[in-house]
Amino acid sequence: MGKVIGIDLGTTNSAMAVYEGNEAKIIANKEGKNTTPSIVAFTDKGEILVGESAKRQAVTNPEKTIYSIKRIMGLMFNEDKAKEAEKRLPYKIVDRNGACAIEISGKVYTPQEISAKILMKLKEDAESYLGESVTEAVITVPAYFNDSQRKATKEAGTIAGLNVLRIINEPTSAALAYGLDKKESEKIMVYDLGGGTFDVTVLETGDNVVEVLATGGDAFLGGDDFDNRVIDFLSAEFKSETGIEIKNDVMALQRLKEAAENAKKELSSAMETEINLPFITADATGPKHLVKKLTRAKFESLTEDLMEETISKIESVIKDAGLTKNEISEVVMVGGSTRIPKVQERVKAFINKDLNKSVNPDEVVAVGASIQGGVLKGDVKDVLLLDVTPLSLGIETLGGVMTKVIDRGTTIPAKKSQVFSTAEDNQPAVSIMVLQGERELARDNKSLGKFDLQGIAPAPRGVPQIEVTFDIDANGILTVSAQDKNTGKSQEIKISGSSGLSDSEIEKMVKDAELHKEEDARKKEVIEARNHADSLAHQTQKSLDEHKTNLNENDANEIQNAINALKDCIKNDNATKAELEDKTKLLAQAAQKLGEAMANKNNAEQPKKKDDDVIDAEVE
């Protein structure tokens, strides 16, 4: 086994490191720099440029220069974030089988292919640095990346000729790089604000174990968004002075983007900077120049809501971890955007602790990934990473209920099974709808995929045993299978991400679940009452048909009338829990006479004991 490199495939910049000689080392690229711009360009001569060379020619070739590709990785074309990206990015985003792709000179490229070109350069530069072939890597992703985004990242590695041994979450990787696994037992918060994504993770460390307690974030919040606020401000000022909408000119927009990014960086050390873009555009009166002073105070006011959004996520993640702010012993700052003074000031003020900035925020994630590579190779001993799944996973069961199989916050890798049954007599197949979210009802959660298990042997409802297994691997990628325990027939689905979950949706789901907690509970109670009523009506009708001859006519009619009344109540969509329970109780009382008649009959069948492992929920 050769050397395993750790790669931080970033939105703005990427970095790589290797673990050798009992330490992690950053690998410089061929240009001698520790980070490589995550930019790919296609020239008119047919050349493909990656990194610094692509960045240098971006102003003169904006429509064929691809940056921030991570923002559309695993994104569906019809999502709001895709429409937002279309407005912001100068290159053409197109629909490819429902997912986002880009079009350059009539050819369509997936985000995986573009990312693979970045990874190929990193791989080649690592081989040049190490003097040997590199075929294996650990690649980091934001903790809040969903299943489709993780798969897309792994596919990019495969396209680049890398065997991706592990997909690791960026905050967890950062914790390793800081050596937090070797400290006394502590509660650590990692605040990771990169170029395009934001993560906040609370971990417990000690005794060479790094355990994630809770994680949150936004895959569409980062330095790019801070740049965009400056771009919007400058373009609005320019329009008010000249009447020209500068953002309609892709070449001017690219110059504006570079100027905004540079201004942001300069304001990290200066209180004021000047943006000077001569000949930015022209109209009938001649060329126009953009010259504008931007103060740190103005920049902070333009981006204040973005900073506050990160603070609100800190608050919710600490709450999810079951902790208070005072229990956080250390705050680790990761990502280039944490250099913004106001970001540091707000985080420090909220947590009321000094910030740990001991490692370069642009390099720390790659360093951690290389340490994980060392763990997998066996060079690093006794380090255990325990990450978690950010949302609950389950299936839709009878009545449209979300039945959870793996709860939110479960340590991964994880594998869990539950046994379900059929909802109808002689049901030949079941449909398994895989869901992700925190709401009680299936329709309020995100559908990840659906598959059918065919060939179920004819049997009364509730008799077949269908074992559904959820398996999340160490990369956070999900496989769901279903098996008929009687026939042995099985079916499985690897969640393809065709309806992948965006991180903003995850955040919204958690908030919606909290807002609708009581309402959802009431709805679930009604559904459970209806399911119980339906089961009793079905079983009583079946028993009545078999043993009617053992009853007098009045008793038989009384039971049948009670069954009919309960069925009418079940069919009424507006029936309340109380109404369903009342009708169920009346039928149960009427059916006592049927039970007595069955007991008195010598050949009465004893009710079959229900399998303790069978979950009292049915799949349709």
UniProtKB/Swiss-Prot annotation:
Induction: By stress conditions e.g. heat shock. The keyword Transmembrane helix does not apply. It comes from the Bacteria. This is Chaperone protein DnaK. Belongs to the heat shock protein 70 family. The keyword ATP-binding applies. GO terms for molecular function: ATP binding; ATP-dependent protein folding chaperone; unfolded protein binding. Acts as a chaperone. Keywords: ATP-binding, Chaperone, Nucleotide-binding, Phosphoprotein, Stress response. It comes from Helicobacter pylori (strain G27).
